[in-house]
């Protein structure tokens, strides 16, 4: 026994709880119903901690065949579905195997004297049922490998052929004398069928037996036997396992309830097959050892539970409650309870005591230091569920092993210590009872104490009771979070509520002696023992046990030469599992190439499943954009490869680009990149609104979780995403300078217009009387100053005015070129004209314009054209302009045209900036245009500026054909049209 790889170590234990229930502690539902035919009639239920390097100290031990290690098993190990062998002894066994796995299976307890011979894996229905299928076993075969994958579905042994296996060397089965429970006519050269094979995966949930695919050429199917028909008629039903999490169930109803929340999409196909197999099994009372298998349960299923209590609804009273402390009246009981909690928080804030900084605001526990309190809040009172938190106590533990030890020492299966005293609703979680009270007993007289769950119906006693809990003489329950005012209340609570209230559903129908393994989580242990290849849920190896009953021990424990080095290798490569304090193992497991291939294959299978599901996804044609990364989705399978958890924070996503952006933004070394992604998509994100189409609920980007919660609560509601473009205004230096120029430009604009308009009136007289060269020279000298002044006015308003404004300035400057040097001096004298005189002058102008309209038919045609356009952008064809120019005989028009084509004109540069150049109008065109506008709008125009300009222009109009006057009038009329 020195070379035994399964030799127990003192400190190597897995993070599974192995608890032997004593006889006096057994609940009524745990007691035995019938005696087992064995030497020891003491077979309790085991809820146990399995050691990875030592056998379970129990009455049930599994046998392992030394010659048939399977290297091709994935996702767990064989369950009890094939066969089981139990040995009622507590001694340790050695393994003289010829080909052991590198990392020894945890639950294997092989027999030291097992024969190196051929095996038959075959189900059976009765003890002593012997078949002849061992005759087809070839003695020359070396080893059989079974690849049990999850893709093949459930166990099909009840209707399928029997699998045969051949050992390493040629030998036969030599059985011991069977016990009294055996049939007497046992052929010693034929193998005795056993009942189950223990799993090799202690931390991963054991799957049910799948239909094996033969991976070796030496695998042979036993044909010509009648075991299939007998098995389907008289066999015991095999334990079923959940196809997703592989938790075993002996009955169909608990499996249904489990699959409803675990994998509802697979329940129809699974239960359809399960019903067919269960209906074919009639004899369920056969007392055989296959009933004593291994059941794996989680802590949540074994220890926690809920009970609805009295379903009858309580009558609503709508009672008001008055707080005698602040004399405030609350409308219902829930608001009064919240008010009292608010009072308590205010009193704690006002009294700066050390207890306020060390008391948890959630469970009201006191801690030595504020740092420990903060650690407690972050690890326990978190929205994320961790496998190291006890929901009953609301405490977090270092490892899963410590949690399981705590559950064993302090809690019972199906314990529900938190009770609603109104309707007897019970739960293992305090938050469930509190939420139940606030929803079911709202608008009643009942007031719930958050410290001891006592219900009081009057406000004043409730407040006194509430304040008594703040005193130091309180009695805390050591097994939950409740605290009581008297010791008697605490003791009554412990005796009445800290015991099994409802048996877990998974334990219904289990025979006595069933070994139940409790685990804190489904997958590999994260904080407990170091994971080995046999622990991983993706791939593991398992050795099939020899077909023997529990009282048959094979002889010929001969070892082959190849078994010794393999045994040494297995012993050396077997890792030491972690100690209870969570320390890591000293040796790393050596993973064989076969196991690496299996893990790679398993991961590729999982990925292919996801990609296949997404590739087959039906979606509408068109462009699909991801809400998270705002990019186009070309391939759903590649864009959403898997569900990723950030290792630094609580960020989770399925979008690959969003995960990369998150890591670069928040967890990269260069924080400058943090804002690049924000700037790119912040404008789009700010304009997103989610609207529920069935109700009035809506939310923005910050309330996406609220919309998801709303849609999950209301299954029939649908959501619509409304996207609006929101301009993000970032003030720059250019914008600020424009804003500063905008105000003075608007003030300068009317002043410059008023200055220009009286200049036009003065220039009319100057231009009509002076035609000599001296006037032309004076006007050329004055031209530069006028252009400079007008250019300043136009440049200040250039950014705010439209293109037509620059044209107006251009025309104004062209009119200024015809004036003399005295125009600037006379501009200020005509600004303050009286409004009464202006009205009279407007009427006079109207009469003159009507007379001029009647004089020429050409002007009437032109006025009809202007009426059609009625805007400052009216233009004339070159032919009409040519005809109009020929009809005019005024010399000033030639000067006007000559000045317009001069390259030195500054105003021409200003007009070029507007990219639109208007042709100059003749005097007749201007007069007709002005008359038309006055007739259309009447003399009562509200524009005061236009009235002033017209009055100034009509003071000194000699003949009405001055080009400078007409140009200024056109510009003013254009401005009035724009206004």
From Swiss-Prot:
Compositional bias annotation for Low complexity: 527-541
Subcellular location: Nucleus
Matches recorded under InterPro entries: DUF4195 (IPR025243), Snail/Krueppel_Znf (IPR050527), Znf_C2H2_sf (IPR036236), Znf_C2H2_type (IPR013087)
Placement of covalent cross-link Glycyl lysine isopeptide (Lys-Gly) (interchain with G-Cter in SUMO2): 32, 34, 74, 87, 126, 140, 189, 210, 223, 233, 275, 284, 292, 550, 740, 976
Zinc finger residue extent: C2H2-type: 321-343, 358-381, 388-412, 418-441, 449-469
Acidic residues bias: start-end ranges: 970-979
Keyword hit for Amino-acid biosynthesis: no
UniProt superkingdom: Eukaryota
Bias kind Basic and acidic residues: ranges: 739-784, 798-809
BP term (GO), one: regulation of DNA-templated transcription
UniProt region (Disordered), positions on chain: 89-119, 157-236, 523-608, 739-809, 896-979
Protein's name in the database: Zinc finger protein 280D
Organism: Homo sapiens
Gene label: ZNF280D
């Amino acid at each position: 026994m020195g070379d035994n790889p399964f030799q127990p170590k003192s400190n190597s234990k897995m993070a599974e709880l192995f608890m032997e229930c004593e006889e006096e502690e057994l609940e009524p539902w745990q007691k035995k119903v019938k005696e087992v035919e064995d030497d020891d009639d003491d077979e309790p239920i085991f809820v146990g901690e399995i050691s990875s390097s030592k056998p379970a100290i129990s009455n049930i031990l599994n046998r392992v065949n030394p010659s048939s290690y399977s290297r091709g098993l994935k996702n767990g190990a064989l369950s009890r579905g094939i066969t089981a062998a139990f040995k009622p002894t507590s001694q340790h066994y050695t393994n003289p195997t010829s080909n052991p796995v590198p990392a020894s299976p945890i639950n294997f307890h092989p027999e030291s004297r097992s024969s190196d011979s051929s095996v038959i894996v075959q189900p059976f229905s009765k003890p002593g049922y012997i078949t002849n299928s061992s005759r087809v076993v070839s003695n020359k075969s070396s080893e059989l490998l079974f690849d049990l994958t999850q893709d093949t579905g459930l166990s099909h042994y009840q209707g399928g052929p029997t699998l045969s296996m051949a050992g390493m060397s040629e030998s036969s089965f030599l059985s011991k004398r069977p016990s009294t429970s055996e049939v007497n006519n046992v052929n010693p050269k034929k193998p005795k069928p056993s009942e189950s094979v223990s799993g090799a995966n202690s931390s991963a949930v054991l799957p049910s037996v799948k239909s094996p695919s033969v991976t070796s050429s030496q695998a042979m199917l036993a044909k010509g036997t009648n075991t299939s028909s007998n098995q389907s008629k008289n066999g015991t039903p095999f334990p079923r396992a959940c196809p997703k999490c592989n938790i075993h169930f002996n009955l169909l109803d608990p499996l249904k309830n489990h699959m409803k929340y675990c994998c509802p999409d697979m329940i129809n196909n699974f239960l359809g097959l399960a019903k067919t197999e269960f209906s074919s099994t009639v004899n369920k009372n056969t007392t055989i050892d296959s009933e004593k298998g291994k059941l794996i349960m989680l802590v949540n299923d074994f220890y926690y539970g809920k009970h609805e209590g009295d379903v009858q609804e309580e009558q609503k009273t709508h009672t008001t409650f008055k707080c005698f402390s602040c004399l405030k009246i609350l409308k219902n009981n829930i608001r009064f309870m919240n008010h009292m909690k608010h009072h308590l928080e205010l009193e704690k804030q006002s009294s700066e005591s050390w207890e306020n900084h060390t008391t948890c605001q959630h469970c009201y526990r006191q801690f030595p230091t504020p740092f420990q309190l903060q650690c407690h809040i972050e690890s326990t009172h978190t929205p994320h569920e961790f496998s190291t938190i006890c929901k009953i106590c609301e405490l977090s533990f270092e490892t899963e092993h410590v949690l399981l030890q705590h559950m064993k020492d302090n809690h019972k299966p199906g314990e529900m210590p938190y009770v609603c005293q109104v309707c007897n609703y019970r739960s293992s979680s305090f938050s469930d009872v509190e939420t139940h009270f606030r929803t079911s007993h709202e608008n009643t007289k009942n007031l719930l104490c958050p410290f001891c769950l006592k219900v009081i119906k009057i406000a004043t006693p409730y407040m006194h009771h509430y304040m008594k809990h703040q005193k130091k003489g309180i009695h805390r329950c050591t097994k939950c979070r409740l605290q009581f005012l008297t010791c008697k209340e605490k003791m009554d609570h412990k005796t009445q509520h800290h015991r099994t209230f409802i048996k877990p559903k998974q334990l219904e129908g289990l025979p006595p002696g069933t070994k139940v393994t409790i685990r804190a989580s489904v997958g590999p242990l994260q904080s407990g023992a170091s994971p080995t290849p046999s622990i991983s849920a993706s791939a593991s190896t398992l050795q099939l046990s020899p077909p023997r009953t529990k009282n048959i021990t094979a002889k010929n424990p001969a070892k082959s030469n190849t078994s010794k080095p393999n045994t040494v290798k297995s012993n050396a490569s077997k890792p030491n599992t972690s100690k209870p304090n969570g320390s890591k193992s000293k040796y790393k497991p050596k993973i064989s190439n076969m196991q690496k291939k299996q893990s790679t294959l398993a991961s590729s299978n999982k990925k292919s499943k996801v990609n296949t599901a997404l590739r087959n996804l039906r979606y509408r044609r068109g462009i699909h954009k991801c809400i998270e990364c705002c990019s186009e989705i070309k391939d759903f399978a590649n864009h959403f490869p898997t569900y990723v958890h950030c290792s630094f924070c609580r960020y989770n996503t399925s979008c690959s680009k969003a995960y990369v952006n998150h890591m670069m933004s928040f967890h990269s070394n260069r924080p400058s990149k943090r804002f690049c992604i924000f700037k790119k998509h912040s404008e789009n994100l700010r304009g997103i609104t989610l609207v529920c189409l069935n109700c009035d609920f809506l939310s923005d980007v910050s309330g996406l979780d609220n919309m998801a919660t709303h849609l999950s609560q209301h299954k029939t509601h649908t959501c619509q995403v409304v996207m609006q473009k929101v301009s993000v205004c970032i003030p720059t230096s250019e914008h600020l300078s424009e804003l500063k120029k905008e105000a003075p430009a608007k003030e300068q604009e009317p002043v410059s217009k008023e200055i220009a308009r009286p200049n036009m009136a003065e220039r009319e007289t100057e231009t009509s009387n002076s035609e000599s060269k001296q006037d032309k020279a004076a006007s050329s000298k004055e031209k530069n100053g006028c252009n400079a002044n007008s250019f300043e006015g136009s440049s200040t308003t250039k950014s705010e005015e439209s293109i037509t404004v620059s044209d107006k300035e251009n025309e104004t400057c062209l009119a200024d070129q015809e004036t003399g040097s005295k125009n600037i001096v006379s501009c200020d004298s005509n600004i303050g004209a009286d409004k009464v005189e202006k009205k009279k002058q407007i009427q006079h102008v109207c009469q003159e314009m009507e007379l001029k309209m009647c004089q020429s038919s050409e002007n009437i045609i032109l006025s009809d054209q202007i009426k059609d356009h009625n805007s400052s952008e009216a233009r004339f064809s070159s032919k009409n302009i040519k005809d109009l120019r020929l009809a005019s005989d005024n010399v000033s028009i030639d000067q006007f045209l000559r000045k317009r084509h001069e390259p030195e004109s500054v105003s021409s540069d200003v007009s070029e900036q507007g990219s639109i150049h208007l042709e100059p109008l003749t005097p007749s065109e201007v007069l007709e245009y002005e008359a038309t506008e006055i007739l259309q709008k009447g003399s009562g125009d509200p524009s005061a500026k236009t009235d002033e300009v017209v009055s100034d222009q009509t003071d000194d109009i000699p003949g009405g054909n001055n080009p400078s006057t007409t140009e200024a009038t056109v510009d003013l009329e254009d401005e009035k049209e724009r206004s």
